[in-house]
């Protein structure tokens, strides 16, 4: 069930679903696994907000366990394609593709709430079929793994060798550890939230 927000205006009351209301404030909320439908919705929202105002920042709030690599890369590429900066905020959990998208925010504008958790790892996949089919899938997952690791190395400032080691298995970080790692730029505390409001 999606919450509804009722607003008073000179012409009476208007009801919005919460996500539409947030979008008016240039806030996109990723609160589920990344799928094709989710990615298409987020890409459309990013493009819409760019068309509305190409100079004003967009805020992507993330509470996601990850999801489809290909769909996540579509969001990532769109974030880097559009003119407005995309500020990212981790609220709860940014794992796997969620962490990748968190790191994809504009430099200096990647943040997390204090008690959030961030997790990076290598892409997961499975293959079945004939030997040649399995070989094709294995080559693709190795390509994706290398691509994701190179992007994370660039976004964090960590050496590629460290990213490769750390993503070999689930690698969890606190918000402050993610700052030290270079995945985000700062931890937002209650005082900072009030100062920006």
Curated annotation (Swiss-Prot):
Active site: 96, 121
Localization of this protein: Cytoplasm
Keyword Hydrolase among record annotations: yes
Keyword Protease: yes
EC number from the UniProt entry: 3.4.21.92
Any matching Pfam family: CLP_protease
Main localization (coarse): cytoplasm
GO molecular function: ATP-dependent peptidase activity; ATPase binding; serine-type endopeptidase activity
Single GO cellular component term: cytoplasm
Keywords: Cytoplasm, Hydrolase, Protease, Serine protease
InterPro entries given in the database record: ClpP, ClpP/crotonase-like_dom_sf, ClpP/TepA, ClpP_His_AS, ClpP_Ser_AS
Gene3D superfamilies registered for this protein in UniProt: 2-enoyl-CoA Hydratase, Chain A, domain 1
Reaction catalysis annotation: Hydrolysis of proteins to small peptides in the presence of ATP and magnesium. alpha-casein is the usual test substrate. In the absence of ATP, only oligopeptides shorter than five residues are hydrolyzed (such as succinyl-Leu-Tyr-|-NHMec, and Leu-Tyr-Leu-|-Tyr-Trp, in which cleavage of the -Tyr-|-Leu- and -Tyr-|-Trp bonds also occurs)
Biological process terms in GO annotation: protein quality control for misfolded or incompletely synthesized proteins
Its biological purpose: Cleaves peptides in various proteins in a process that requires ATP hydrolysis. Has a chymotrypsin-like activity. Plays a major role in the degradation of misfolded proteins.
Quaternary context: Fourteen ClpP subunits assemble into 2 heptameric rings which stack back to back to give a disk-like structure with a central cavity, resembling the structure of eukaryotic proteasomes.
Family, similarity comment: Belongs to the peptidase S14 family.
Xref: NCBIfam families: clpP, PRK00277.1, PRK12551.1, PRK12553.1
Name of the protein this chain belongs to: ATP-dependent Clp protease proteolytic subunit 1
Source species of the chain: Synechococcus elongatus (strain ATCC 33912 / PCC 7942 / FACHB-805)
Name of the gene: clpP1
């Amino acid at each position: 069930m999606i919450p509804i927000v009722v607003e008073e205006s000179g012409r009476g009351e208007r009801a919005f679903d919460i996500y539409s209301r947030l979008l008016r404030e240039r806030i996109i909320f990723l609160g589920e696994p990344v799928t094709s439908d989710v990615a298409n919705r987020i890409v459309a929202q990013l493009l819409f907000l760019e068309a509305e105002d190409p100079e004003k920042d967009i805020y992507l709030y993330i509470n996601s366990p990850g999801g489809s690599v290909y769909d996540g890369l579509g969001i990532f590429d769109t974030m880097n394609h559009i003119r407005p900066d995309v500020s990212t905020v981790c609220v709860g959990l940014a794992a796997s593709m969620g962490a990748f998208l968190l790191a994809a925010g504009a430099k200096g504008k990647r943040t997390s709430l204090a008690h959030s958790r961030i997790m990076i790892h290598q892409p997961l996949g499975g293959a079945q079929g004939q030997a040649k089919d399995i070989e094709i899938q294995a080559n693709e997952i190795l390509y994706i793994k290398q691509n994701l690791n190179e992007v994370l190395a660039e976004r964090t400032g960590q050496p590629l060798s460290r990213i490769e080691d750390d993503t070999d298995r689930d690698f969890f970080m606190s918000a402050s550890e993610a700052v030290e790692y270079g995945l985000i730029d700062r931890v937002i505390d209650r005082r900072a939230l009030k100062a920006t409001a």
